[in-house]
Amino acid sequence: MKKFTIRFIGALIPLYVLVLFYIFYISPNLSGDLGNIGQIPFGKDYSNAIGKNYLLRSRVIQFTDKNMNSRYKIGTIGDSFSQQGINGYQNYLANLENTDILNFKWEINCGAPQTAINLLNSGVFSNSYFKVVIIECVERQLIYRLSTVNFGNKSFKDSTVNEHKQIDKENYKPFLENVFSWIRLSCGYNNPVNKVQLDANYFDSPTYGNKLFFYEYDLSFKTIDKNDITIAKSNLTKIVRLFESKGIKLIFMIAADKYDVYQSFIIHNPYPKNRTLDYFKDFEAYPYFVNSKQILYPLVRNGVKDVYLMNDSHWSYKASQVVAKELKKRIYILSNTK
């Protein structure tokens, strides 16, 4: 029995070592959504350095029942690219326009385009004055979100509380589960974060400057159905017309995937080329349509570092600034168009 106990304890020593390594090195150095999703210890220095450039306060107001009847010049509806707080494009736009912006959380399992239709049909927009409403949708979900819009849906509920509960539930995992996830992901098994080599340093990081980390779902374009593309484009036109019929100017912005923006700079790229945004070229002549890749790709090509965050799937404050300037131009054009 004693020998068995000694052998059992001995067998657990490697696990103890791994747990201690995770506690004292891996966990404290997780940063960015890609770092947390992929259990990659990027460290905190990069995020801390980037954070020193953020605006000091946010002028983005979250929609609640209490401010339903308030008047705002600009309203925004979007996914995680529209929930970036002080470093988000809305905050820079708010400062350029010198006005607060009202942001609507997208409904769980709904998406920004459908949430926008729900708000329009339920009369929420009729209670608030908007000069313009901006709908933002990330590229990897663009076709699905647009092609599945139900234009007859009138239900809307503020999803902020439920959303936070869902996020808390997803973020909370038993400690050992995190350890085993790190071991599994470190072995490359079913890792949702991909890594490729770039032809130059596109990020201000001594360790990962020439590496591109991106979300596996950035490759979801490989399964796009052509019929869904046709429906998506038709629905986008219909959404714009519906807002116009209510007297509301609309801007539809696509938040380009990180992989799409950097794919031309990957050495020996093992993945196919993403051409999703090519399907929407016929919309580029319209002032209501904003393809953020056209704004951000030239920055990367000209050597601007950290257009997107090295350790995150989202763009940085640098991109937010440039996107905000473009949105300001579009708002001016639309405001002077009958």
Regions found by a protein language model. Give the residues of each.
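Extracellular glycan-modifying ectodomains
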Residues: 1-338
